[in-house]
Amino acid sequence: MSNKVLAGRYELFERVGEGGMSVVYKAKDKLLNRFVAIKILKPEFINDHKFIDSFRRESQAAASLSHPNIVNIYDVGREGNIHYIVMELIQGKTLSDYIKEQGPMPYPKVIALSKQIAAALAFAHKNHIIHRDVKPHNVMITPNGTAKITDFGIAKAVNAATIVDNTEGIIGSVHYFSPEQARGGYVDEKSDIYSLGIVMYEMLTGRVPFDGDNPVNIALMHINGEMIPPSKLVDGVPPALEHIILKCTDKYPVNRFASADELIEALNNLEFVSTVEGDSVLVNGKNRDE
């Protein structure tokens, strides 16, 4: 695929990533003289016309989102059997890779990244777009520490049967499913808040709360399983931060934060003091329900 030119405009270079549905290439937009990322659907999806229509529709809707914490979509196109999305090229690594390399993060870093991800979700939700697949693999971290979410709306194009696909990307999504997603039920912004809570848990502890040998077992754990509090796995977890994570991941949507903005407010209400050694220590947290 390298050196191919799409639409007479996008010259493909090296492969830079791969997910359950697609392969991502670095490319050059010869018209605007800039580098971009191009996500190309894998061949096994191109004959599902209902999926393709939904994929294009959701991608075009997501292209309307312009926010500092969202990866911009520039173009959606097709050339023969190649269906593609042209996106902002981000220098950095996925949050998934960051966690694998660094392990559990200091809680000030968890809070800073969580606020950025929540800000992206809040903006999308106000524009009536639900992500449905918030997970570390879909969050890019730039060298200056900015979090940028990708793949907005794409998960809506994937039917429920794909969770049993044998690709790592789609199976990986089950670790972040809300209980209502696991049941195949109604999904709204509170489902994204649940998934972000799981991401926060993983950033803080270095592991997901529910794991198993197959996607069905993991999905059932989201519905019925009891989550081990982060403080049982990592020393020094501030109770106020743990409270926020557990509220995000409540089994019942009505008990979660009402919106991503409310979650941001709770994170902003966490108070820190500096120690003699120069470290930040969380001393208080005021949540709306307290």
Indicate where each model-derived feature is located.
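Protein kinase catalytic-loop region centered on the HRD/HxD motif
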Residues: 117-129
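Conserved short submotifs of the Hanks-type protein kinase catalytic core
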Residues: 80-94, 98
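C-terminal lobe helix-coil module of Hanks-type protein kinase domains
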Residues: 175-274
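Activation-segment/catalytic-loop signature of the eukaryotic protein kinase fold
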Residues: 76
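AlphaC helix of the eukaryotic protein kinase fold
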Residues: 42-64
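Activation segment signature within eukaryotic-like protein kinase domains
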Residues: 113-114
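Activation segment of protein kinases
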Residues: 49, 143-186
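Protein kinase glycine-rich loop
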Residues: 13-19, 24
